[in-house]
């Protein structure tokens, strides 16, 4: 790994099965979520590191969670609705990245899937039973302006 590669940062995320994508879309509809994240954008961030690391993506498709709960997080851009996942797998993959030297901008890692980046003044809470099945992990150079891809 060259110095340039180390300094460019690394992004790793999990993408989910069609079964999970269907369930997430149904959840958005049943909750009447404003500004829903499109199906093809559903993911769970595993690593958002300002330095590159030799992360090896996992292969295989299996359930990584079967439950979670809804939370609204206040962000610089508004109120974001997330499904916080009860996932030891995603937490372990994040710890693997940290063990390899990944940085992390927050005090804790919270595995989640964003359902909307802007729900306005609405609030959501409650437990959710949903099959969260990993389709694949992927990695790419870190994009600091990732929110521009959402528009």
Swiss-Prot record:
Residues holding 3',3'-cUAMP: 11, 140, 146
Function: Counteracts the host CBASS antiviral defense system. Phosphodiesterase that enables metal-independent hydrolysis of the host cyclic di- and trinucleotide CBASS signals such as 3'3'-cGAMP, 3'3'cUA, and 3'3'3'-cAAA. Does not cleave cGG or cA4. Besides evasion of the CBASS system, might also enable evasion of the type III CRISPR systems that use cA3 signals.
The reaction(s) this protein catalyses: 3',3'-cUAMP + H2O = U[3'-5']pAp[3'] + H(+); 3',3',3'-c-tri-AMP + H2O = A[3'-5']pA[3'-5']pAp[3'] + H(+); 3',3',3'-cAAG + H2O = G[3'-5']pA[3'-5']pAp[3'] + H(+); 3',3',3'-cAAG + H2O = A[3'-5']pG[3'-5']pAp[3'] + H(+)
Keywords per UniProt: Host-virus interaction, Hydrolase, Inhibition of host innate immune response by virus, Viral immunoevasion
Binding site for 3',3'-cGAMP: 11, 140, 146
Catalytic residues (UniProt): 43, 45, 112, 114
An annotated GO BP: symbiont-mediated suppression of host innate immune response
Family annotation (Pfam families): Acb1
Lineage of origin: Viruses, Duplodnaviria, Heunggongvirae, Uroviricota, Caudoviricetes
Organism of origin: Shigella phage SP18
MF term (GO), any: hydrolase activity
Record protein name field: Anti-CBASS protein Acb1
Entry-linked InterPro entries: Acb1-like_C (IPR056175), Cyclic_Pdiesterase (IPR009097)
Stated family: Belongs to the anti-CBASS protein Acb1 family.
């Amino acid at each position: 790994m060259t110095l340039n590669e180390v300094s460019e940062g690394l992004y790793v995320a999990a993408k989910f099965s069609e079964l999970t994508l269907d369930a997430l879309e149904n959840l958005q509809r049943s909750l009447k979520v404003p500004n829903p994240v499109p199906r093809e954008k559903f993911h769970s961030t595993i690593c958002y590191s300002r330095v590159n690391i030799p992360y090896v993506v996992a292969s295989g498709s299996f359930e990584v969670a079967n439950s979670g709960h809804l939370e609204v997080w206040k962000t610089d851009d508004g109120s974001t609705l997330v499904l916080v996942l009860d996932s030891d797998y995603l937490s372990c993959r994040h710890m693997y990245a940290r063990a390899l030297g990944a940085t992390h901008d927050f005090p804790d890692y919270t595995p989640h899937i964003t359902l909307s980046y802007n729900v306005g003044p609405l609030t959501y809470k409650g437990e959710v039973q949903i099959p969260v099945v990993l389709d694949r992990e992927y990695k790419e150079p870190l994009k600091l302006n990732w929110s521009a891809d959402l528009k």
